[in-house]
Amino acid sequence: MASLTISQIQAIKEHMTDDVSMLSKKFKAKKNPYDTQTVLLNELDVYLSKGWEEVSKLKYKVRIQKLKPAGRRFEDDIWCMFYNLGFRHLNYDENLVVQWGDNPEDKHQLDVVAIGEEAIFVVECKATENIKPASFKKDIDDMRLYRDGVMKALRQIYGEDKKVKFIFATRNYTFAEGCEDEKRLAENKIFQFTDNTYDYVNSLIKAYKSTVIYQFYGLMFRHERINNDKIRIPALKGTMGGHTYYMLSIEPATLLKIGFVLHRTRVNTQITMPTYQRLLVPSRLKGIGEFIDKKNGYFPNSVIINFDDSERKNRIQFDLASGGSDDTRTKLGYLTIPNAYCIAYIIDGQHRVYGYAGSKYKDTNTIPVVAFDGLPSDEQLRIFMDINEHQKAVSPSLRLDLNEDLNWESPHLDSRLKALRSSIIKQLGRDNSSVLARKIAIGEDTAKLQLKPFDTALSKSSLLPKATKKEFTVSIIQIVLNITKQC
């Protein structure tokens, strides 16, 4: 596609704004799920017949409201989410149309566009009032068709160096695991943004406050390069428990960009590593920031991370330095780290790291880090459990949630049953076709029902076998016979 003309650029800018006052007013209107207006009292019956409802009444006028259609309500919620993430350059209305091809008809209306310092986000929103199966082949194909042209147009206006992420956001649509829609989105590097993702990002906003952008970028641009400059840091290489690790000192600003916290939440099930972390405690985060800035405080204990080695292009490299010692197995050298999002999983120390996010020292201080390289998932999980069992107790809900990962391959039968119960309950809570979908609090997700009563009920029921470490005390065959008799 040829470059945009001056008139085309102006047409796009007319529907975008970075005016703080205007954005604040838009946010107030968009966060309300209802359309509202004031009408004359003698007009009220006409509006009531069209689905409006009365809110308040004055002498001659009435304040009325009407629930926004599902599609527009969802678009407004996504817009507000970006506003709460800190974006202050957004589309002003729903009439933003971009020319993406050479033909006059090659145009597309964009639902939500958010411009950040490093990236531009383009969101296609699809919503329905009631839960229904997804079928978006045409919509995804259309997005694939206009993507490159829209990307070029937005970069021409807002900066060639900006990343552009396309998001396909849905509400109340169910996707079968491994379905064609999911494959199409993945193949075209379009981020699939479901109800679970929306809930997770909003929980991040509440917990992380102004520091949320680091975790959000890690989620959106997982394993994508920040830039082509590599990070080279002096380090000591050692082995412990049969695993390679490095001791190094790194600026918090750097670790915030390449790091990622694996929260125990539905949205992170797509990540191939174990998810186990609790969300940050906002008051604790604020206290750490004040401790660093106002009291010149510091934390001499090491943050523990694990470098993800699943992609060859993002693997770290250690080069020996000259003049090393033969008196120790520890090796002195330089660690080269790819400058990419979400390649360093923070096992312990997330509050310390994020406490620096708003600090004036995030670029000048360095913090001690113990970094594992390609630590197996079960070992990473055990480190987290070992550390936290001797510090703040792991919540009963999180412990039961982790049973599946900890005990699925256990040699002990009773432990495997713990894993099975955990898996069954989580499936009930995650499957959108289940009556319990999103109603069971799993990991760090909040819901009306707790996981523990379900685990207790299953363990006492006759639906699953009973077992000691080495043998079943109630056979599966006997359970089937009992159920058959009851039927």
Q: What is each residue range found by the language model?
A:
Residues 1-226:
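Intrinsically disordered, low-complexity Ser/Thr/Pro/Gly-rich regulatory segments
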Residues 98, 124-126, 293, 299, ...:
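Glycosyltransferase catalytic domains, chiefly GT-A lineage
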Residues 102, 131-139, 276, 313-322, ...:
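Short, flexible/disordered intra-domain loops and linkers
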Residues 109, 363-487:
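Solvent-exposed functional surfaces
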Residues 136-151, 179-181, 282-288, 420-421, ...:
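Well-ordered, non-membrane alpha-helical segments in soluble/globular domains
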Residues 156-163, 296-299, 362-364:
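Short helix-terminating capping/connector loops at secondary-structure junctions
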Residues 175, 180-340, 371-374:
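N-terminal leader or domain-start segments enriched in small/polar residues
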Residues 300, 305-306, 327-387:
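A short, basic-hydrophobic beta/loop patch
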